[in-house]
Amino acid sequence: MTGKQLFEFELHSDVLIVTPNGPFIEFRDNDFRNAYNEAYRLLSEPGTRHLLVDFSNLDYFGSTFVSLLLRLSQKARACKGESALCHLSDNMRGMLKTLMLLENPKVDFSMSSHANRDVALQYLADVTSRTNEKKQ
């Protein structure tokens, strides 16, 4: 492997932004495990609720990544948050819809798709606002 990391992480308010750095063929299983563990740890931090995965550096992903994405989405849901995706290619969007993981209200780990990071962050901020209003 080169010095490149599988994921880049950023925190924006209560949102963990994960940017995968493809192609994944450059990475080993241990790299996936370490990246997942770090993302899970960051989602477990107090005040972090939502997950945003930015696919701007990725053209394709396989079943290993789908499994990782599912587990992180379930963790966000356990934190009373949601998962959002942005910059999905048509092929990625189609695959996630076929797997019934994208915009599917019948599952508790459904993800929403957005054109870009700003739109996704606004969506998640609105979710937080609605949740905070319900608490009052």
PLM region spans:
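Short, Lys/Arg-enriched, disordered terminal segments
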Residues: 1-2, 136
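STAS-typified acidic loop motif
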Residues: 2-38, 55
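Amphipathic, Lys/Arg-enriched alpha-helical "gate/interface" segment within cytosolic domains
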Residues: 11, 32, 45-46, 50, ...
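Residues that form or flank phosphate/diphosphate-binding pockets in enzymes
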Residues: 27, 61-63
